Amino acid sequence: MLGIVKMEGHETTDWSNYYQDTQEAYSSVPVSNMTQGLASMNTYMTMNPMSSSSNMTAAGSFNMSYGNSGLGAGLSPSGMSGMGAGAASAMNGMGSGVPSMGTALSPSNMNAMSAQQASMNSLSYSSMNPGMSPMAYGSSNMNRARDTKTFRRSYPHAKPPYSYISLITMAIQQAPSKMLTLSEIYQWIMDLFPYYRQNQQRWQNSIRHSLSFNDCFVKVARSPDKPGKGSYWTLHPDSGNMFENGCYLRRQKRFKCEKTQGGKGNQDGRKDHSGPSSPLQRVHGKSSQMDSSSSMSNPSSSPQALEHNGSNGEMKPQVAAGPSPLSSHQNHSTHSLAHESHIHLKGDPHYSFNHPFSINNLMSSSEQQHKLDFKAYEQALQQYSSYGGGLPGMPLGSPSMSGRGNIEPSALEPTYYQGVYSRPVLNTS
Protein backbone atom coordinates (compact mmCIF):
# COMPACT_ATOMS: atom_id res chain seq x y z
CA MET A 1 0.00 0.00 0.00
CA LEU A 2 1.59 3.19 -1.08
CA GLY A 3 1.72 6.12 1.24
CA ILE A 4 -0.91 8.79 1.24
CA VAL A 5 -0.03 11.81 -0.86
CA LYS A 6 -0.99 15.08 0.88
CA MET A 7 -2.53 17.70 -1.29
CA GLU A 8 -1.34 21.21 -0.41
CA GLY A 9 -3.36 23.14 -2.99
CA HIS A 10 -6.67 24.63 -1.88
CA GLU A 11 -7.54 26.80 -4.86
CA THR A 12 -9.37 25.87 -8.02
CA THR A 13 -6.34 26.57 -10.16
CA ASP A 14 -4.28 24.17 -8.13
CA TRP A 15 -6.84 21.42 -8.64
CA SER A 16 -7.02 22.09 -12.35
CA ASN A 17 -3.27 21.56 -12.64
CA TYR A 18 -3.64 18.02 -11.46
CA TYR A 19 -6.63 17.24 -13.69
CA GLN A 20 -6.66 18.58 -17.21
CA ASP A 21 -10.35 17.84 -17.56
CA THR A 22 -12.30 20.65 -15.98
CA GLN A 23 -15.32 18.46 -15.43
CA GLU A 24 -13.50 16.45 -12.81
CA ALA A 25 -12.53 19.47 -10.72
CA TYR A 26 -14.59 20.81 -7.83
CA SER A 27 -15.01 24.32 -9.13
CA SER A 28 -18.14 25.52 -7.38
CA VAL A 29 -17.63 23.79 -4.04
CA PRO A 30 -16.24 26.17 -1.44
CA VAL A 31 -12.94 24.80 -0.37
CA SER A 32 -13.04 26.58 2.97
CA ASN A 33 -15.83 24.27 4.12
CA MET A 34 -13.80 21.18 3.36
CA THR A 35 -10.50 22.15 4.92
CA GLN A 36 -10.91 19.84 7.86
CA GLY A 37 -12.81 17.13 5.98
CA LEU A 38 -10.39 16.64 3.10
CA ALA A 39 -7.16 15.45 4.58
CA SER A 40 -5.85 12.96 2.09
CA MET A 41 -6.51 11.53 -1.31
CA ASN A 42 -5.82 8.04 -2.56
CA THR A 43 -5.38 7.68 -6.32
CA TYR A 44 -6.06 3.91 -6.40
CA MET A 45 -9.18 1.85 -6.68
CA THR A 46 -9.17 0.78 -3.05
CA MET A 47 -10.80 2.56 -0.17
CA ASN A 48 -9.43 2.77 3.33
CA PRO A 49 -11.95 1.16 5.66
CA MET A 50 -13.52 3.33 8.32
CA SER A 51 -13.83 1.59 11.62
CA SER A 52 -16.37 3.86 13.30
CA SER A 53 -18.14 7.17 12.82
CA SER A 54 -15.90 8.83 15.38
CA ASN A 55 -12.95 8.52 13.01
CA MET A 56 -14.70 10.69 10.48
CA THR A 57 -15.10 13.77 12.66
CA ALA A 58 -11.53 14.98 12.67
CA ALA A 59 -10.21 13.75 9.36
CA GLY A 60 -11.66 11.70 6.54
CA SER A 61 -10.32 10.09 3.41
CA PHE A 62 -11.05 11.36 -0.04
CA ASN A 63 -10.79 8.45 -2.48
CA MET A 64 -10.78 9.04 -6.22
CA SER A 65 -9.97 6.83 -9.19
CA TYR A 66 -9.03 7.91 -12.71
CA GLY A 67 -11.61 5.57 -14.19
CA ASN A 68 -14.29 7.63 -12.47
CA SER A 69 -15.84 4.41 -11.18
CA GLY A 70 -16.41 5.55 -7.65
CA LEU A 71 -15.85 8.54 -5.41
CA GLY A 72 -15.80 8.46 -1.65
CA ALA A 73 -15.54 11.48 0.59
CA GLY A 74 -15.13 11.54 4.31
CA LEU A 75 -16.81 14.66 5.58
CA SER A 76 -16.73 16.14 9.05
CA PRO A 77 -19.96 17.21 10.79
CA SER A 78 -19.04 20.88 10.34
CA GLY A 79 -18.59 20.35 6.60
CA MET A 80 -21.88 18.54 6.27
CA SER A 81 -23.85 21.34 7.88
CA GLY A 82 -23.37 23.55 4.86
CA MET A 83 -24.52 21.02 2.37
CA GLY A 84 -28.02 21.61 1.14
CA ALA A 85 -30.14 20.32 -1.62
CA GLY A 86 -27.80 21.66 -4.29
CA ALA A 87 -24.70 19.92 -2.91
CA ALA A 88 -25.11 16.95 -5.21
CA SER A 89 -25.46 19.14 -8.32
CA ALA A 90 -22.39 21.11 -7.36
CA MET A 91 -20.23 18.04 -7.37
CA ASN A 92 -19.76 17.30 -11.08
CA GLY A 93 -18.09 13.98 -10.45
CA MET A 94 -21.24 12.62 -8.92
CA GLY A 95 -23.51 12.89 -11.91
CA SER A 96 -25.41 10.27 -13.77
CA GLY A 97 -22.24 8.93 -15.36
CA VAL A 98 -20.89 7.80 -11.98
CA PRO A 99 -22.22 4.33 -11.15
CA SER A 100 -22.42 4.88 -7.43
CA MET A 101 -20.97 6.90 -4.60
CA GLY A 102 -20.32 5.75 -1.09
CA THR A 103 -20.17 8.37 1.62
CA ALA A 104 -19.41 7.54 5.23
CA LEU A 105 -21.57 9.82 7.33
CA SER A 106 -21.96 10.25 11.04
CA PRO A 107 -25.38 9.23 12.42
CA SER A 108 -26.18 12.79 13.63
CA ASN A 109 -25.92 14.33 10.15
CA MET A 110 -27.99 11.79 8.23
CA ASN A 111 -31.07 14.04 8.38
CA ALA A 112 -29.30 16.73 6.34
CA MET A 113 -29.22 14.63 3.21
CA SER A 114 -31.77 15.62 0.57
CA ALA A 115 -33.83 13.42 -1.74
CA GLN A 116 -31.35 13.92 -4.59
CA GLN A 117 -28.68 12.10 -2.59
CA ALA A 118 -30.56 8.80 -2.72
CA SER A 119 -27.92 7.42 -5.04
CA MET A 120 -25.36 7.72 -2.27
CA ASN A 121 -25.18 4.38 -0.54
CA SER A 122 -24.59 4.42 3.17
CA LEU A 123 -21.92 1.78 3.61
CA SER A 124 -21.56 -0.33 6.71
CA TYR A 125 -18.27 -1.07 8.38
CA SER A 126 -17.87 -4.28 6.42
CA SER A 127 -18.93 -2.71 3.09
CA MET A 128 -17.29 -3.48 -0.20
CA ASN A 129 -14.85 -1.38 -2.19
CA PRO A 130 -16.46 1.59 -4.00
CA GLY A 131 -14.44 0.59 -7.07
CA MET A 132 -16.74 -2.42 -7.31
CA SER A 133 -19.82 -0.28 -6.84
CA PRO A 134 -21.80 -1.71 -9.79
CA MET A 135 -21.65 -5.11 -8.08
CA ALA A 136 -21.99 -3.81 -4.56
CA TYR A 137 -24.47 -5.68 -2.40
CA GLY A 138 -26.44 -4.33 0.48
CA SER A 139 -25.86 -5.54 3.99
CA SER A 140 -28.98 -7.63 3.88
CA ASN A 141 -27.99 -9.27 0.58
CA MET A 142 -24.51 -10.16 1.74
CA ASN A 143 -25.79 -12.34 4.55
CA ARG A 144 -26.97 -15.35 2.62
CA ALA A 145 -29.82 -17.25 4.13
CA ARG A 146 -27.98 -20.46 5.05
CA ASP A 147 -30.09 -21.16 8.08
CA THR A 148 -33.06 -22.15 5.97
CA LYS A 149 -31.12 -25.00 4.34
CA THR A 150 -31.18 -28.14 6.44
CA PHE A 151 -27.95 -30.08 6.07
CA ARG A 152 -28.97 -32.93 8.37
CA ARG A 153 -32.03 -34.42 6.84
CA SER A 154 -34.51 -36.36 8.89
CA TYR A 155 -35.44 -39.82 7.65
CA PRO A 156 -38.72 -40.85 9.25
CA HIS A 157 -38.72 -44.11 7.29
CA ALA A 158 -35.10 -45.06 7.91
CA LYS A 159 -34.19 -48.50 9.17
CA PRO A 160 -34.09 -48.54 12.98
CA PRO A 161 -30.72 -49.40 14.54
CA TYR A 162 -32.02 -52.52 16.28
CA SER A 163 -31.36 -56.15 15.58
CA TYR A 164 -34.18 -58.60 15.06
CA ILE A 165 -33.55 -60.10 18.48
CA SER A 166 -33.90 -56.63 19.99
CA LEU A 167 -37.16 -56.04 18.15
CA ILE A 168 -38.61 -59.36 19.32
CA THR A 169 -37.49 -58.73 22.90
CA MET A 170 -39.03 -55.25 22.92
CA ALA A 171 -42.31 -56.59 21.56
CA ILE A 172 -42.51 -59.40 24.12
CA GLN A 173 -41.51 -57.26 27.09
CA GLN A 174 -44.08 -54.57 26.28
CA ALA A 175 -46.89 -57.08 26.00
CA PRO A 176 -49.13 -57.34 29.10
CA SER A 177 -48.93 -61.15 29.18
CA LYS A 178 -45.19 -61.18 28.30
CA MET A 179 -45.92 -63.49 25.37
CA LEU A 180 -46.97 -62.89 21.79
CA THR A 181 -47.77 -64.90 18.72
CA LEU A 182 -45.78 -64.54 15.55
CA SER A 183 -48.42 -62.41 13.85
CA GLU A 184 -48.65 -60.15 16.90
CA ILE A 185 -44.89 -59.63 16.82
CA TYR A 186 -45.12 -58.68 13.16
CA GLN A 187 -47.91 -56.21 13.83
CA TRP A 188 -46.14 -54.60 16.77
CA ILE A 189 -42.99 -54.01 14.71
CA MET A 190 -44.91 -52.52 11.78
CA ASP A 191 -46.92 -50.22 14.04
CA LEU A 192 -43.83 -48.85 15.75
CA PHE A 193 -41.40 -48.65 12.80
CA PRO A 194 -42.74 -47.51 9.40
CA TYR A 195 -39.64 -48.93 7.71
CA TYR A 196 -40.89 -52.48 8.18
CA ARG A 197 -44.16 -51.80 6.41
CA GLN A 198 -42.46 -52.66 3.15
CA ASN A 199 -40.48 -55.74 2.12
CA GLN A 200 -42.38 -57.72 4.70
CA GLN A 201 -41.40 -61.12 3.41
CA ARG A 202 -37.68 -60.51 3.93
CA TRP A 203 -37.66 -59.28 7.49
CA GLN A 204 -40.43 -61.63 8.58
CA ASN A 205 -38.28 -64.58 7.53
CA SER A 206 -35.46 -63.13 9.61
CA ILE A 207 -37.81 -62.78 12.58
CA ARG A 208 -38.79 -66.45 12.31
CA HIS A 209 -35.17 -67.54 12.10
CA SER A 210 -34.25 -65.46 15.12
CA LEU A 211 -37.05 -67.04 17.12
CA SER A 212 -36.04 -70.56 16.15
CA PHE A 213 -32.26 -70.39 16.47
CA ASN A 214 -31.91 -68.43 19.71
CA ASP A 215 -32.29 -70.11 23.07
CA CYS A 216 -33.53 -66.92 24.69
CA PHE A 217 -36.92 -67.37 22.99
CA VAL A 218 -39.20 -70.18 24.11
CA LYS A 219 -42.23 -71.47 22.26
CA VAL A 220 -45.31 -71.86 24.46
CA ALA A 221 -48.30 -73.89 23.34
CA ARG A 222 -51.74 -72.36 23.41
CA SER A 223 -53.95 -73.08 26.39
CA PRO A 224 -57.51 -74.36 25.87
CA ASP A 225 -58.98 -71.12 27.14
CA LYS A 226 -57.14 -69.19 24.37
CA PRO A 227 -58.11 -70.81 21.09
CA GLY A 228 -56.51 -69.57 17.93
CA LYS A 229 -53.78 -70.20 15.40
CA GLY A 230 -50.10 -70.21 16.19
CA SER A 231 -48.15 -70.74 19.36
CA TYR A 232 -46.96 -68.08 21.74
CA TRP A 233 -43.38 -66.92 22.03
CA THR A 234 -41.89 -65.69 25.28
CA LEU A 235 -38.49 -65.00 26.79
CA HIS A 236 -36.58 -67.74 28.54
CA PRO A 237 -36.86 -67.32 32.33
CA ASP A 238 -33.11 -67.84 32.74
CA SER A 239 -32.12 -65.42 29.99
CA GLY A 240 -32.09 -62.50 32.43
CA ASN A 241 -31.37 -58.99 31.24
CA MET A 242 -29.65 -59.44 27.91
CA PHE A 243 -29.64 -55.72 27.22
CA GLU A 244 -27.80 -53.31 29.50
CA ASN A 245 -30.03 -50.72 31.22
CA GLY A 246 -32.81 -51.24 28.72
CA CYS A 247 -30.63 -50.25 25.76
CA TYR A 248 -31.59 -52.48 22.87
CA LEU A 249 -28.83 -51.37 20.55
CA ARG A 250 -26.48 -54.13 21.65
CA ARG A 251 -26.72 -57.23 23.75
CA GLN A 252 -24.47 -57.83 26.73
CA LYS A 253 -24.04 -61.53 26.05
CA ARG A 254 -25.48 -64.33 23.99
CA PHE A 255 -27.77 -66.54 25.99
CA LYS A 256 -27.23 -70.30 25.77
CA CYS A 257 -29.54 -72.77 27.45
CA GLU A 258 -27.54 -75.22 29.59
CA LYS A 259 -30.28 -77.84 29.51
CA THR A 260 -30.12 -78.03 25.76
CA GLN A 261 -26.37 -78.44 25.85
CA GLY A 262 -26.64 -81.16 28.50
CA GLY A 263 -29.22 -83.02 26.46
CA LYS A 264 -26.98 -82.94 23.43
CA GLY A 265 -24.07 -84.21 25.49
CA ASN A 266 -26.09 -87.14 26.79
CA GLN A 267 -27.11 -88.06 23.30
CA ASP A 268 -23.49 -87.99 22.20
CA GLY A 269 -22.55 -90.17 25.14
CA ARG A 270 -25.20 -92.70 24.27
CA LYS A 271 -23.91 -92.79 20.73
CA ASP A 272 -20.38 -93.47 21.95
CA HIS A 273 -21.44 -96.29 24.28
CA SER A 274 -24.04 -97.80 21.98
CA GLY A 275 -21.55 -100.36 20.71
CA PRO A 276 -18.28 -100.64 18.84
CA SER A 277 -19.93 -101.88 15.69
CA SER A 278 -22.36 -98.98 15.20
CA PRO A 279 -19.82 -96.44 13.78
CA LEU A 280 -18.37 -99.05 11.49
CA GLN A 281 -21.73 -100.19 10.29
CA ARG A 282 -22.66 -96.56 9.69
CA VAL A 283 -19.47 -95.86 7.73
CA HIS A 284 -19.13 -99.17 5.89
CA GLY A 285 -22.78 -99.90 5.26
CA LYS A 286 -22.32 -100.09 1.53
CA SER A 287 -19.08 -102.02 1.85
CA SER A 288 -20.83 -104.94 3.52
CA GLN A 289 -23.28 -105.09 0.64
CA MET A 290 -20.41 -105.13 -1.83
CA ASP A 291 -18.75 -107.91 0.14
CA SER A 292 -21.89 -110.04 0.12
CA SER A 293 -22.28 -109.56 -3.63
CA SER A 294 -18.63 -110.47 -4.21
CA SER A 295 -18.96 -113.61 -2.11
CA MET A 296 -22.02 -114.64 -4.13
CA SER A 297 -20.22 -113.99 -7.42
CA ASN A 298 -17.13 -116.00 -6.32
CA PRO A 299 -18.41 -119.22 -4.79
CA SER A 300 -14.99 -120.82 -5.03
CA SER A 301 -13.55 -118.48 -2.41
CA SER A 302 -16.16 -119.22 0.22
CA PRO A 303 -15.11 -122.87 0.84
CA GLN A 304 -11.53 -121.73 1.33
CA ALA A 305 -12.64 -119.20 3.89
CA LEU A 306 -14.51 -121.96 5.70
CA GLU A 307 -11.41 -124.12 5.68
CA HIS A 308 -9.37 -121.34 7.30
CA ASN A 309 -11.88 -121.09 10.11
CA GLY A 310 -11.03 -124.63 11.07
CA SER A 311 -8.31 -125.95 13.38
CA ASN A 312 -4.60 -125.47 12.94
CA GLY A 313 -4.11 -129.08 12.09
CA GLU A 314 -6.21 -128.69 8.98
CA MET A 315 -4.15 -125.69 7.88
CA LYS A 316 -0.74 -127.46 8.07
CA PRO A 317 -1.34 -130.02 5.34
CA GLN A 318 -2.90 -127.32 3.22
CA VAL A 319 0.30 -125.26 3.35
CA ALA A 320 2.53 -128.31 2.85
CA ALA A 321 0.61 -129.47 -0.22
CA GLY A 322 1.83 -129.53 -3.83
CA PRO A 323 2.39 -126.62 -6.19
CA SER A 324 -1.23 -126.39 -7.29
CA PRO A 325 -2.54 -125.84 -3.71
CA LEU A 326 0.08 -123.11 -3.27
CA SER A 327 -1.05 -121.27 -6.36
CA SER A 328 -4.68 -121.51 -5.31
CA HIS A 329 -3.68 -120.35 -1.82
CA GLN A 330 -1.96 -117.28 -3.28
CA ASN A 331 -4.99 -116.45 -5.39
CA HIS A 332 -7.18 -116.68 -2.32
CA SER A 333 -4.77 -114.46 -0.34
CA THR A 334 -4.80 -111.83 -3.06
CA HIS A 335 -8.57 -111.93 -3.14
CA SER A 336 -8.75 -111.57 0.64
CA LEU A 337 -6.39 -108.58 0.60
CA ALA A 338 -8.51 -106.88 -2.05
CA HIS A 339 -11.50 -107.13 0.27
CA GLU A 340 -9.60 -106.70 3.51
CA SER A 341 -11.64 -103.75 4.71
CA HIS A 342 -14.98 -105.32 3.76
CA ILE A 343 -14.90 -108.87 5.12
CA HIS A 344 -15.16 -108.53 8.89
CA LEU A 345 -17.18 -105.47 9.80
CA LYS A 346 -18.64 -106.79 13.01
CA GLY A 347 -16.66 -106.35 16.18
CA ASP A 348 -15.23 -109.19 18.22
CA PRO A 349 -17.81 -110.15 20.89
CA HIS A 350 -15.05 -111.09 23.35
CA TYR A 351 -13.61 -107.56 23.19
CA SER A 352 -16.78 -105.51 22.94
CA PHE A 353 -15.61 -103.18 25.69
CA ASN A 354 -12.66 -101.93 23.63
CA HIS A 355 -12.50 -98.77 21.58
CA PRO A 356 -14.73 -99.03 18.49
CA PHE A 357 -11.80 -98.21 16.18
CA SER A 358 -9.26 -100.58 17.74
CA ILE A 359 -7.59 -103.28 15.66
CA ASN A 360 -9.36 -106.09 17.51
CA ASN A 361 -12.72 -104.66 16.60
CA LEU A 362 -11.75 -104.17 12.98
CA MET A 363 -10.35 -107.68 12.54
CA SER A 364 -11.70 -110.99 13.79
CA SER A 365 -9.63 -113.91 15.00
CA SER A 366 -10.00 -115.85 11.76
CA GLU A 367 -8.80 -112.89 9.74
CA GLN A 368 -5.78 -112.55 12.01
CA GLN A 369 -4.89 -116.21 11.50
CA HIS A 370 -5.29 -115.81 7.76
CA LYS A 371 -2.99 -112.75 7.69
CA LEU A 372 -0.39 -114.51 9.84
CA ASP A 373 -0.50 -117.47 7.48
CA PHE A 374 0.10 -115.16 4.54
CA LYS A 375 3.05 -113.54 6.36
CA ALA A 376 4.57 -116.97 6.92
CA TYR A 377 4.22 -117.70 3.23
CA GLU A 378 5.96 -114.42 2.32
CA GLN A 379 8.82 -115.17 4.73
CA ALA A 380 9.22 -118.60 3.23
CA LEU A 381 9.53 -117.10 -0.24
CA GLN A 382 12.17 -114.63 1.00
CA GLN A 383 14.24 -117.40 2.61
CA TYR A 384 13.98 -119.48 -0.53
CA SER A 385 15.21 -116.62 -2.72
CA SER A 386 18.11 -115.91 -0.33
CA TYR A 387 19.37 -119.48 -0.71
CA GLY A 388 19.38 -119.06 -4.50
CA GLY A 389 16.85 -121.81 -5.07
CA GLY A 390 15.30 -120.01 -8.06
CA LEU A 391 14.89 -116.73 -9.84
CA PRO A 392 12.55 -114.04 -8.50
CA GLY A 393 10.58 -114.12 -11.76
CA MET A 394 9.89 -117.83 -11.49
CA PRO A 395 6.22 -118.80 -11.27
CA LEU A 396 5.06 -120.29 -8.05
CA GLY A 397 4.03 -123.55 -9.70
CA SER A 398 7.47 -124.28 -11.26
CA PRO A 399 9.59 -127.31 -10.23
CA SER A 400 12.12 -125.01 -8.57
CA MET A 401 9.69 -124.65 -5.72
CA SER A 402 10.65 -128.14 -4.61
CA GLY A 403 13.44 -126.59 -2.53
CA ARG A 404 10.91 -125.34 -0.01
CA GLY A 405 11.69 -128.38 2.11
CA ASN A 406 14.64 -126.49 3.60
CA ILE A 407 12.29 -124.02 5.32
CA GLU A 408 11.87 -124.44 9.04
CA PRO A 409 8.48 -126.07 9.65
CA SER A 410 7.80 -124.04 12.75
CA ALA A 411 7.87 -120.84 10.69
CA LEU A 412 4.83 -122.01 8.75
CA GLU A 413 2.71 -122.59 11.83
CA PRO A 414 0.31 -119.83 12.86
CA THR A 415 1.08 -120.48 16.52
CA TYR A 416 4.65 -119.37 15.88
CA TYR A 417 3.48 -115.87 14.91
CA GLN A 418 0.77 -115.80 17.50
CA GLY A 419 3.49 -115.81 20.12
CA VAL A 420 5.05 -112.77 18.47
CA TYR A 421 1.81 -110.86 17.72
CA SER A 422 -0.41 -111.66 20.64
CA ARG A 423 -3.78 -110.13 21.35
CA PRO A 424 -2.61 -107.71 24.09
CA VAL A 425 -0.13 -106.19 21.66
CA LEU A 426 -2.79 -105.62 19.02
CA ASN A 427 -5.18 -104.08 21.48
CA THR A 428 -4.91 -100.28 21.21
CA SER A 429 -7.52 -99.40 23.79
Swiss-Prot record:
Q: Where is the composition biased (Basic and acidic residues)?
A: 258-274
- According to its UniProt record, where is this protein mainly located? nucleus
Which PROSITE patterns does the UniProt record give? FORK_HEAD_1, FORK_HEAD_2, FORK_HEAD_3
* Any coiled-coil regions, as ranges: none
Organism name: Xenopus laevis (African clawed frog)
- Pfam families per record: Forkhead, Forkhead_N, HNF_C
Q: Which GO terms describe its biological process?
A: anatomical structure morphogenesis; cell differentiation; regulation of DNA-templated transcription; regulation of transcription by RNA polymerase II
Q: What protein am I looking at?
A: Forkhead box protein A1-A
Residue spans of biased composition, Low complexity class: 287-304
Subcellular location(s) per record: Nucleus
DNA-binding region residues: the ranges are 159-253
Supply the source organism's classification.
Eukaryota, Metazoa, Chordata, Craniata, Vertebrata
Record's SMART domains?
FH (SM00339)
* Function, in words: Probable transcription factor.
The UniProt record lists the keyword Oxidoreductase = no
Q: Which GO terms describe its molecular function?
A: DNA binding; DNA-binding transcription factor activity; DNA-binding transcription factor activity, RNA polymerase II-specific; protein domain specific binding; RNA polymerase II cis-regulatory region sequence-specific DNA binding
**Segment Disordered: which positions?**
258-341
Gene symbol of the encoding locus: foxa1-a
Tissue-wise, where is it found? At neurula stage, expressed in the notochord but not in the neural floor plate. During tailbud stages, expressed in the neural floor plate. At stage 35, expressed in the rhombencephalon, mesencephalon, pharyngeal pouches, foregut and pronephros. At stage 44, expressed in a region of the gut on the right hand side of the embryo. Expressed in the adult lung and liver.
